[in-house]
Structure formats: C-alpha cells, structure tokens
Amino acid sequence: MAKVLVLYYSMYGHIETMARAVAEGASKVDGAEVIVKRVPETMPPQLFEKAGGKTQTAPVATPQELADYDAIIFGTPTRFGNMSGQMRTFLDQTGGLWASGALYGKLASVFSSTGTGGGQEQTITSTWTTLAHHGMVIVPIGYAAQELFDVSQVRGGTPYGATTIAGGDGSRQPSQEELSIARYQGEYVAGLAVKLNG
C-alpha cells in the first residue's frame, strides 16, 4: 500500500476544492491510501475572520509526519509568485527531516491557485526548489490531461501542475476543467507511488 498525502493551505477555499479533486483522483488508484491534511493557519483568528477566511475541516498536519508518506502532493495559493506564507512556515520547520534525509526519494507534486493567472507556474517551480533540497522526486503532469489543450475559456492548469484562477476578488470557483486536471494529477502521482512502493 502506497501512502499519499494531499497537503494544502487555503484561505478562501479554492485550494481546498482543488485538494479534494486531487484526492478524488488519487483514490481511484488501487493500492493507494490517500490522506488529506492542511498546514496550520498562522494568521491571528480575528484577522483571518476579518479577511473573509474560510473555516476548513481537514485535520492539521505536522512537519514530522511527512516522513510517513510515499508521495506528497502540495497545494498552495500564489503569493507574489511564491507559495503562501503559511506553507512556507510549515516547510521551514522540516529542517530535521532534511538533516536525516527522511524525505529523500519520496514523490512530490504541486498544485496552485492565483487571482489573475500571474505567477501560477512560478509558484509551482519555486516550491519545487524546497522539495529538491529534500531530495524528493518532482512529478510534473506534462500535457497528458487533455483539458490543458483547451484555450476556449479562461482556465488554469499547466504542465507543471493543476492550477485554478480565482479572479481578483476571489469570486471565480475552480471550473470543471481545472478540477479534472487536478483529479488527473492525483491519479497520476498515486499511480507512480503504487508502482514504486506498492
């Protein structure tokens, strides 16, 4: 059995929705045990509420537990072309895992969201840098998801990983095409994890 963690941060629910789709895709793979968790919120509760943050039910992960999984699919909103501060804070606590090589050889993939599309690919590739320092095997999705060829509408999604465009005010929710790409990413990564560890 390959253990797959979908680990995300979501303030307004866009990445949470994408995380559920990633997990749904991963759960299609026989021999994959899929867990969905989120990183801790670092914003004070009053400010989080004032900013319109969405309460989420996924359990909170600890950095130490990352060593328990064969594959980790990270989801983060874009903050100026980088991962969110909450995800950065979480990953900055993995120094002990780095020192022991606990994540070396584990699969890693990334999905993201942006307000207007700017920085979605940069967010994924800049997150890869941290994962590479851990010796994780980076898994992009390429162009196997056919939705990536559809240019008839505004759509997130890249060969690096699934993305969604939330709109400047956050009112746009992930489209069916974006969720389909996210499901593909989960299924693809889980399938590789089972082949390597199952």
From Swiss-Prot:
Residues 4-189 form the Flavodoxin-like domain. It catalyses: a quinone + NADH + H(+) = a quinol + NAD(+); a quinone + NADPH + H(+) = a quinol + NADP(+). FMN binds at residues 10-15, 78-80, 113-118, 133. Pfam families: FMN_red. Binds 1 FMN per monomer. Its cofactor is FMN. NAD(+) binds at residue 12. Its EC number is 1.6.5.2. It comes from the Bacteria. Keywords: Flavoprotein, FMN, NAD, NADP, Nucleotide-binding, Oxidoreductase. GO terms for cellular component: membrane. GO terms for molecular function: flavin adenine dinucleotide binding; FMN binding; NAD binding; NADH:ubiquinone reductase (non-electrogenic) activity; NADP binding; NADPH dehydrogenase (quinone) activity. Substrate binds at residue 98. InterPro entries: Flavodoxin/NO_synth (IPR008254), Flavoprotein-like_sf (IPR029039), Flavoprotein_WrbA-like (IPR010089), FMN_Rdtase-like_dom (IPR005025), NQO (IPR037513). Belongs to the WrbA family. HAMAP family: NQOR. This is NAD(P)H dehydrogenase (quinone). It comes from Escherichia fergusonii (strain ATCC 35469 / DSM 13698 / CCUG 18766 / IAM 14443 / JCM 21226 / LMG 7866 / NBRC 102419 / NCTC 12128 / CDC 0568-73).
